[in-house]
Amino acid sequence: MMNETRTTIDQDEIDRFSRIAAEWWNPKGKFRPLHQLNPTRLAYIREKICLAFNRDPVSLMPFENLKILDIGCGGGLLCEPMARLGAMVVGVDAAQTNIEVAKLHATQSDLSIDYRTTIAEALADKGEKFDIILNMEVVEHVADVNLFIAATAKMLKSQGVMFVSTLNRTWKAWGLAIVGAEYILRWLPKGTHDYKKFLKPQELKNLLSKNALTVIDEIGITYNPVNDSWNRSKDMDVNYLLLAKRP
């Protein structure tokens, strides 16, 4: 049964994203940074999944027969490209409004994606297993990160991989992701991020290791203001992504 006293839900976070749900598919709207970031993270995800599962990276549908979970899927910005690459995709989000937007857009795009309004621990209790879990820009928004990582790790099949991206707890991240992005450039609504919820890479690695997952790759993702683009980097001071595998 789902734990009655502990939950990953942060209702304030859910309410905040619910208020701007209609913006998900507007590339110039409140989720503009995610639209800009998407090509970089998609290229990395595709490359690493093909390596992990010995798939042809130039194939039109290299993810065929792979089951992917996108946890905290929002409006489906990652679910849709995963489905186009042939995967069986389950997208979950705690905000009903996000799921409604995602379902509508998938229908308009003629894509079959299993969208559900639920939370990590409730889904884990059902015993479903996935080849790949996308845990992208979510851990900094949950109420109990230990419970969240435990629940998501529980759903990963043997030899499966999980991508986890978040923000580092550094003054540089505070200055760029909060002061810069929310208050100066106003890319994101004020209050989108809580610095106390940022995790240092080693802290996240420890949580993954505690749940029998081994980190096999790590990258930083940095913003280049000159050409207004996001790129892979060795600099993990702000945005970073870990790739973990279950033996």
From Swiss-Prot:
GO terms for molecular function: 2-polyprenyl-6-hydroxyphenol methylase activity; 3-demethylubiquinol 3-O-methyltransferase activity; polyprenyldihydroxybenzoate methyltransferase activity. Keywords: Methyltransferase, S-adenosyl-L-methionine, Transferase, Ubiquinone biosynthesis. SUPFAM superfamilies: S-adenosyl-L-methionine-dependent methyltransferases. It is an enzyme of class 2 (transferase). Pfam families: Methyltransf_23 (PF13489). One of its GO terms (biological process) is methylation. It comes from the Bacteria. S-adenosyl-L-methionine binds at R41, G72, D93, M136. The keyword Transferase applies. PANTHER family: METHYLTRANSFERASE, UBIQUINONE BIOSYNTHESIS O-METHYLTRANSFERASE, MITOCHONDRIAL. This is Ubiquinone biosynthesis O-methyltransferase. It comes from Bartonella quintana (strain Toulouse). The gene is ubiG.
